[in-house]
Amino acid sequence: MRLAVWMPFQQAVNFLSDMLSVQVSKAQVVRQTEAAGAAYVSVQNEQAERIEREAPEALPGSDKLVMSADGAMVPLRKGEWAEVKTLAIGEVQPAVKKQHEWVVRTRNISYFSRLVNAAQFEPLSLVEVHRRGLEKSRQVAAVMDGAEWLQSLVTYHRPDAVRILDFAHAGQRIGQVGQALFGEGTPQANQWSSQRLHQLKHEGPQDILVELRQLQQQHPQMEILAENLAYLEKREAQMQYPHFQEQGWPIGSGMVESANKLVVEARLKGAGMHWERSHVNPMLALRNIVCSDRWTDEWPLIVQQLGKQARERRNSNREQRRLARLPEPSAIPEVPPMEALSEPPEKLPKEVAEKPEQSGPRKPAANHPWRNSPIGRALYMPSKDARN
């Protein structure tokens, strides 16, 4: 299983057979690897939900952490492509000056990757942010490109972080202006861009922005110039590179760009690979822990989750068998609904309909036989003929 996280499934099968004489099928390796990955996704989702719900005290952090995030495309089935988002967190080491340049390195880099949208990525990544103690770290910087979802991610996790626009990304914008001014690939364009990048790195963005504003006035029809000027003006505070270097911060997002290649593309973007969408996150979860050198720490959680899922399946199957043995309830005959009359009933004759209904006691008529029947005392009294 662990081999299949590092290499394609069939290569893992061949390695086990050739090196260890262990015979397993590719289907078995695929099934077990995906099950382990899905279990770890469930573990991390539960942890993230608990952190968001209970807001536990943050773990102790480092003196100086840097965070960087980016996206990488992976191939899905049916010719589709989807963006995997990755967050990388590392400890910043003291800057070292080499050949008149400050060199800043990071260590203990860890990763969190998911195939989700930006709004889902923010709370899900809490699990790694909390584990690294980002909230309690004394200093935190976020080196990103200028995408809005990245700035939202920084605001979500550490709003007071020092925000640094990736230097290569800023240089790309300036290079586009040079290509538009002097022609794509011309020596003049390359020379102009190189001079401005050196100026940006060692002097900051102020003079460059002034020059770009003047160029826009001279070339009002040049859309690429107007677009990139607006982009850079909005992020002027994130391009104070001389100050950032003096503070010992990295000014490039190479940490996460390497993560895109190492964590994501090396395993999910190989020749001929096309993934089911539901299988991407399980593999990413396992890639995160092997590339962060945390397999030994996290594997017990995976085993525990797999056991929990197996018990739940057994209980569910047992309950289904119990319900299947129960006698079926006796069928209750259905009463057919009464059919509505196709025609309304005929009206009663007027004299019948209007005949008042009698209520209360009624006296017998004068000639009723009961009038002449002896009842009560009259029964014992002599008749008139007898008295006469």
Region spans (language model):
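Catalytic center-proximal scaffold of phosphoryl-transfer enzymes
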Residues: M1-N388
